[in-house]
Amino acid sequence: MKAKTLLVMLAALVSSPAAAEDFYKDKVVSIVTSTGAGGSYDSMARLFSRHMGRFIPGRPGFVVRNMPGGGNVIATNYMYGVSAKDGLTIATVHNAMPLNQVLGGAGIAYESDKFHWLGSTGPDNSVILVRADAPIRTIQDAMRSEVNLGSTGAGSGLTLLPLAMNRVLGTKFKIIMGYKSSEELNLALDRGEVQARSFGYSSIVSQHPDWLKTRKVRFLAQIGSKRLHDLPDVPLITELATTDEERGILKLISSPPGLGQPYLAPPGTPPDRLAILRRAFEETMKDPAFLKDAAALNLDVDPISAEEITQMILDIIHTAPDIAAKTRVLLNEGGGFSK
């Protein structure tokens, strides 16, 4: 027993910050983001790239790599099966990726519970919004009249949310996919090419405060566990359900916003380097300089720990089979997740 304890102590010494400094010194850590340039995921990743290195022994440099496409699936697959597993690559992937796995999304080659989650910047309700000049003024109007809603790919939460609302609540969103990034989709909304989209509320605050100031958009519904203080009169989609089954399906669909903007390391990352990355991620989110820069960019930070985010993702993955199956069938009938 004493020999075993000694081995554990020696292993701890090998995994010490001093040993890690030998590895990280003069290295560059890549942050892969599953979105294009200009969105809130990209902005937050670039903010981390400027600060996180200060909390890693050896003070490595950081670079952001945008890898959009496939409704965020391309980057997530890359992190699972292709990226280096040496502690020099981390990622922020869209919070719909665990849900996408549960629902059997097209092209998925990852298992969310096999990633090493570092934490998250905090929960963020999504909203369904329309241009203020659209004839649709309430969610009930969207149940009576068709409205063009822009999105990226079939596996994205930007598609899943309105698709689920169409099938469960009877809304008539005509989902137009194919936009390469959130910013490209915003331009389409500005031009009137589409009249509606799903969006993280904090992204609107950080990227388009002018939309709020000039009342360019109107909010029809929000997706999350509780109403935002800023939107007390905008209903949650779960509040619109009329049966327990509908409520269960919409609760599952509403799970991604609670994950916020999660960060991960790929399976196989060495435990000592993973511990350093998790500690650095946590320390960065408490750092006054980081928080000051985040506030200047209108980026909210309400940290979720590695342990918490891991449990939240496991809860999604282990959704009751009947609810997962009904949701999967429902979305397939609606045109999503064809394989």
Residue map of PLM features:
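Hinge/capping helix and adjacent helix->loop/strand transition within the periplasmic-binding protein
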Residues: 23, 29, 54-59, 78-89, ...
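Ligand-binding clamshell of periplasmic/extracellular solute-binding protein-like
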Residues: 48, 70-73, 87-99, 120-122, ...
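Extracytoplasmic "Venus flytrap"
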Residues: 31-46, 68-71, 150-157
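Sec-dependent N-terminal signal peptides
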Residues: 5-14
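Short beta-strand and adjacent tight-turn residues that come in two discontinuous sequence segments
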Residues: 92-93, 152, 178-180, 198-200, ...
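An extracytoplasmic/periplasmic, membrane-proximal ligand-sensing/linker region
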Residues: 25-27, 214-216, 269-339
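A ligand-binding cleft/hinge motif common to bilobed small-molecule-binding domains
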Residues: 95-107, 159-168, 196-240
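N-terminal signal peptide c-region/cleavage motif recognized by signal peptidases
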Residues: 15-19
